[in-house]
A protein has these predicted regions:
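Active-site mouth loops of central-metabolism enzymes
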Residues: 1-19, 100-107, 157-158, 162
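N-terminal small/glycine-rich loop or linker at the start of catalytic domains
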Residues: 1-9, 87, 92-94, 149-150
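Catalytic cores of alpha/beta
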Residues: 24, 63-80, 107-121, 149-158, ...
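Short secondary-structure boundary segments
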Residues: 11, 37, 84, 105-107, ...
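Glycine-rich phosphate-binding active-site loops on the catalytic face of alpha/beta enzymes
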Residues: 6, 84-92, 124-137, 167-200
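Catalytic domains of carbohydrate-active enzymes, especially glycoside hydrolases
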Residues: 22-36, 118
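Alpha-helix-loop-beta-strand connector modules within alpha/beta enzyme cores
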Residues: 46-65, 91-108, 137-164, 197-200
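N-terminal active-site wall of soluble small-molecule enzyme domains
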Residues: 32-95
């Protein structure tokens, strides 16, 4: 199975989550797992992150921390993902050294070129479809993926409302990875380990 999924955590982590994550990652199509928790104390975050790191390492999945490069370094994550409002990408790159650094570029060629100048590891574009995770996210269209495929040598991640019916057009347009969260963790019809199998 191709490793094309960039999996994002649910907004809240409970005790059952770790077994569920283990089952999902054992399906073999996840390349990255991003821990994205807002409004959480640092010590609680570190506890959760350490447990997750053990699971991602077991499955050879890259562990990415959202927003906070200092926490990413502390938990020995493989890298950090930053939005445009999460602080200086230049400083993050300096601190993270050879770790993975990904940046959200929305639907913007200007932001993409700026990210490339800062030597990021991958670029994320979106939101391509309506997303439960970020209902008010800026919209992106497929043209940005086609442009990125032609002009950017770094891997491209597509974000926003992605499901088993729409992901293939993103891959065809130029995305190397597809970022998924709600379809896996909040799926009313499928358990997470079955939902992840829809992306081959």
């Amino acid at each position: 199975m191709k490793k094309l999924v960039y999996l994002i955590s649910p907004g809240k982590i409970n005790k059952k989550f770790y077994n569920s994550l283990n089952a999902v990652l054992s399906q073999g199509n996840v390349k990255f797992f991003q821990l994205r928790l807002k409004k959480i104390k640092a010590n609680r975050f570190l506890k959760i992150a350490k447990k997750i790191k053990k699971i991602t390492s077991r499955h050879k999945v890259k562990f990415i921390v959202n927003d906070n490069f200092n926490l990413a370094i502390k938990v020995k994550a493989d890298g950090c993902h930053m939005g445009q409002l999460d602080g200086s990408i230049k400083i993050a790159k300096k601190k993270l050294k050879n770790k993975i650094l990904g940046v959200t570029c929305h639907n913007s060629k200007i932001l993409a070129n700026k990210a490339i100048k800062n030597k990021v590891s991958y670029l994320a574009f979106g939101s391509f479809f309506k997303s439960k995770l970020k209902p008010n996210a800026r919209k992106a269209n497929l043209d940005i993926l086609k442009w990125a495929k032609k002009n950017i040598k770094k891997p491209i991640v597509a974000i926003g409302g992605i499901n088993n019916f729409n992901y293939k057009k993103l891959i065809k347009s130029g995305a190397k990875y597809i970022a998924i969260s709600s379809f896996i963790w909040d799926n009313p019809k499928l358990k997470p380990e079955l939902a992840i199998r829809k992306f081959k």
